[in-house]
From Swiss-Prot:
InterPro entries: LEM/LEM-like_dom_sf, LEM_dom, LEM_domain. It is found in: Membrane. The chain crosses the membrane at residues 152-172. This is LEM domain-containing protein 1. The gene is LEMD1. Keywords: Membrane, Signal-anchor, Transmembrane, Transmembrane helix. Testis-specific. Isoform 6 is detected in 17 of 18 colon cancer tissues examined. GO terms for cellular component: membrane. The keyword Cytoplasm does not apply. SUPFAM superfamilies: LEM domain. It is a single-pass membrane protein. Pfam families: LEM. Its main location: membrane. Residues 1-45 form the LEM domain.
């Protein structure tokens, strides 16, 4: 029995050469191609004993190796399994718990530190036969109130202070005035 997937590169190359196929270098990118070719050669229906094909008459020049081909057909049991790859790759099973969808509308909203409320789906109501939807996403009142409580962000304050100092420095150097005089 021959397990094509478990053959090393050298053994794969030897098997192909035994069957009359001259493979090139076996690389990870060409390995699957050579495995398929080996399976083709092993599975092909049995014919007469090895046959020597004479030189072909074509217009182009040929090498002496290509002029004679040896066709050997072997019968054998082939295992086309991926047992080796199954053993190596054990994927963790997907969890059955449902993941909550991320609310992309409120990514910039930072809740105040206090009580934590359970996340809920946005409320959608149809009123008086019209198609108006009221959404519970980031209410404008909440963001304005939290901004008033916190004031300006520290980074913004530092940036304004830095720009102010640079403007004062440029003004003093252009006017050639001393800082304390």
């Amino acid at each position: 029995m021959v397990d094509v997937k478990c053959l090393s590169d050298c053994k794969l190359q030897n098997q192909l050469e035994k069957l009359g196929f001259s493979p090139g270098p076996i690389l990870p990118s060409t390995r699957k191609l050579y495995e398929k070719k080996l399976v083709q050669l092993l599975v092909s229906p049995p014919c007469a004993p090895p046959v020597m094909n004479g030189p072909r008459e074509l217009d182009g020049a040929q090498d002496s190796d290509d002029s004679e081909e040896l066709n050997i057909i072997l019968q054998g049991n082939i295992i086309l399994s991926t047992e080796k790859s199954k053993k190596l790759k054990k994927w963790p099973e997907a969890s059955t718990t449902k993941r909550k969808a991320v609310d992309t509308y409120c990514l910039d909203y930072k809740p105040s530190k206090g009580r934590r409320w359970a996340a809920r789906a946005p409320s959608t109501r149809i009123t008086y036969g019209t198609i108006t939807k009221e959404r519970d996403y980031c209410a404008e009142d909440q963001t304005i109130e939290s901004w008033r409580e916190e004031g300006f962000p520290v980074g913004l304050k530092l940036a304004v202070l830095g720009i102010f100092i640079i403007v004062v420095f440029v003004y003093l150097t252009v006017e050639n005035k001393s800082l304390f005089g």
